[in-house]
Amino acid sequence: MGEKPTIAISHLGCEKNRIDTEHMLGLLVKAGYGVDTNEELADYVIVNTCSFIESAREESVKTLVELAEANKKIVITGCMAQHFQTQLLEELPEAVAVVGTGDYHKIVNVIERAEQGERVTLVSAKPTYIADETTPRYRTTTEGVAYLRVAEGCDYRCAFCIIPHLRGNQRSRTIESIVAEAEQLVAQGVQEIILISQITTNYGLDIYGKPKLAELLRALGKINVPWIRMHYAYPTGLTPDVIAAIQETPNVLPYLDLPLQHSHSEVLRSMNRPWQGRVNDEIIERLKIAIPGAVLRTTFIVGFPGETEAQFEHLLQFVQRHEFDHVGVFTFSAEEGTPAYKLSNQLPQEVMDERRDRLMALQQPISWRKNQQEVGKTVEVLIEQENPESGKLIGRSGRFSPEVDGQVYVDGEAKLGTIIPVKIHSADEYDLFGQVVSHN
């Protein structure tokens, strides 16, 4: 048999998609395929697509079209493949395969079949697969950080969200499986493990009959990794037991990523959020009291169908009052196949854009003040890269999660992938600036 083809992967979308990408790379490398970062040199390009909102789809389509124009053999994977497999095959003759979110672990078989001239469609209608610690994985993050998926899929049916259709219902891994993978990551030198799923606070509900996040955090606390960070914690799932586990487990960062989406009870009911109108001041204040120094990140959707000016003002006041450390704002995106798509009272895009801009303008001085509070402190920073032009090191303190939050720009010398003390001397609304604290 001749030499195996080389394969490049173009990764788009969220960190859940990134883990899928890393498993595909691991499986291909184990099977003896050459993996190249240069798409021009590769025989096949796997495009791991995102289909969460319209702008993500546009980026995916743009990438696919560019590769098609370069006459590449394209394997389309990820959420867009799950969502639009028929249209993609019809419109892109260069696509040799379409692989769904529950089928990426069969990527080696897909390439083998494509090599035989078959046009492969492998899309499970209801994804049920979840990789575990035995699935090969080739990490694409910086050496000090790794994402760790604790569960896949979602049992909630929020009116705006297509994720359950794209990723299936929730399926959790066992605590033992997650701990085993965490130990593998630590052996690779990982300093920060970021726990992800669709709803991390619901972890374990499907396999244990009740959420087991507190038990998971305590188990991971016994592992020799400096930082454990959680993403996607629903406020109603932050029970006294979970809060106690965060407090009692030294390597769990007091960083809470709360996808609140809105503050007004009527909008939350329209969104079919699981807590309906229970996102209120009491929940946020309880968290701040229970975990002093907690860093709170959240995301909001503005312009949900029927959102009135008064309801938007309620959101503005909520954000002003609680002074979150980090806020992401999305304008509502009408997704075909979701209940919100059919709602008659859709808002014009210009109204949504204006509301997004107003909310971001309100948050900016809050973020600036929060960062100014770090000036003068010596903080632990995970060094991730070096700017070759300026010589400055770039990293993150525990306040910042990768890609969504700010960074710390550092003068001095340090090894990439290590956590070092840095004295912060200045800050803007996004980033911190500091100097390595020498050990002499």
From Swiss-Prot:
It is found in: Cytoplasm. GO terms for molecular function: 4 iron, 4 sulfur cluster binding; aspartic acid methylthiotransferase activity; metal ion binding; protein methylthiotransferase activity. Residues 140-370 form the Radical SAM core domain. It is an enzyme of class 2 (transferase). Residues 372-438 form the TRAM domain. One of its GO terms (cellular component) is cytosol. Binds 2 [4Fe-4S] clusters. One cluster is coordinated with 3 cysteines and an exchangeable S-adenosyl-L-methionine. Its main location: cytoplasm. Residues 5-116 form the MTTase N-terminal domain. Its EC number is 2.8.4.4. Keywords: 4Fe-4S, Cytoplasm, Iron, Iron-sulfur, Metal-binding, S-adenosyl-L-methionine, Transferase. [4Fe-4S] cluster 1 binds at C14, C50, C79. One of its GO terms (biological process) is tRNA modification. It catalyses: L-aspartate(89)-[ribosomal protein uS12]-hydrogen + (sulfur carrier)-SH + AH2 + 2 S-adenosyl-L-methionine = 3-methylsulfanyl-L-aspartate(89)-[ribosomal protein uS12]-hydrogen + (sulfur carrier)-H + 5'-deoxyadenosine + L-methionine + A + S-adenosyl-L-homocysteine + 2 H(+). [4Fe-4S] cluster 2 binds at C154, C158, C161. Catalyzes the methylthiolation of an aspartic acid residue of ribosomal protein uS12. This is Ribosomal protein uS12 methylthiotransferase RimO. The lineage of its organism: Bacteria, Bacillati, Cyanobacteriota, Cyanophyceae, Nostocales. The gene is rimO.
